[in-house]
Structures are given as C-alpha cells and as structure tokens.
C-alpha cells in the first residue's frame, strides 16, 4: 500500500531528482485536504452499517436478485453480499485517507472479478450496489468529501467491469 506522499517521493526517487514543482503541488493538495479526509473517515466509520444497509435498499433489495432463484436469495448469499459491500466501503475509505488507490488493487481487486465470475456472482449488480453506496456516502459526508470518496468507489467499479 502506498499513500500520496510515498507515491510522490518514490516517483522522484526513481528518477534520481529532487521534488519538482508538480510534485510539491501534489503534496500541497494532499495536505490541504487532510482534515476533510479525516472528518469523512470518521463519519463513514460511525455510519458504515447504515451506509451498506441503505445502499442495498436502493440497489438490490427489491430486485430479482433477492427473490427466490436470485443470486442473493438465501440468507447465506445475502450475508456474503453485505460482507463484501462492507469490505469495499472500508477499503475505499482507507484509499481515500491515503490519497492513493493502490490498496484497492492489492487487497480488493486482484483476482476478484475472476472469483466472482467463477462463483456466478453478478458483477453488474455488485457495481450497482457500489454506486448506490457512493451516493449514500456522499449524502453523509458532503459534496467535497463525497467527490473524493467517489474516486475510490469508481476505481473499484472499473476494476470489476
């Protein structure tokens, strides 16, 4: 896992140079949003179960996927879906705090699409639920933090698509 600071420093180090104006600007932007990120993470942490619950209600609960024969029909499958959404929310929050999506590749996305396909998990419905979670989260944390979190939810969706 990297964070925005490590990413900027590593990039300059690999090139054997000091931080240039662009690198300094990236660091300034990251530090300027630090308080926003921490407040958003605090709000998300305090409301994680409700965020997931609302996202499921908005996107999956009354669809064919939860009816008999649907992929989320049994309690076990439904619980697995809730667990996965909670996992995505947690790791998107970590990535937002770090200002870098690398943790999503390392801990979430590597091999996930293939695993879902082999298990018959509907990726479209998963992406729909993540998008609903993005919307619910933005409503809680506000426009600026919601936009920042949206980057990482979208990153997960792109990795699954």
UniProtKB/Swiss-Prot annotation:
Membrane topology note: Peripheral membrane protein
Post-translation changes: Contains one covalently linked phycocyanobilin chromophore.
Gene3D superfamilies referenced in this protein's UniProt entry, alphabetically: Phycocyanins
Any one biological process term the GO annotation gives: photosynthesis
Residues involved in (2R,3E)-phycocyanobilin binding: 81
Residues with PTM N4-methylasparagine: 71
Cellular component, GO annotation: phycobilisome; plasma membrane-derived thylakoid membrane
Localization: Cellular thylakoid membrane
Subunit (UniProt): Heterodimer of an alpha and a beta chain.
Family: Belongs to the phycobiliprotein family.
Function per UniProt: Light-harvesting photosynthetic bile pigment-protein from the phycobiliprotein complex. Allophycocyanin has a maximum absorption at approximately 650 nanometers.
Protein name: Allophycocyanin beta chain
Designated gene of the protein: apcB
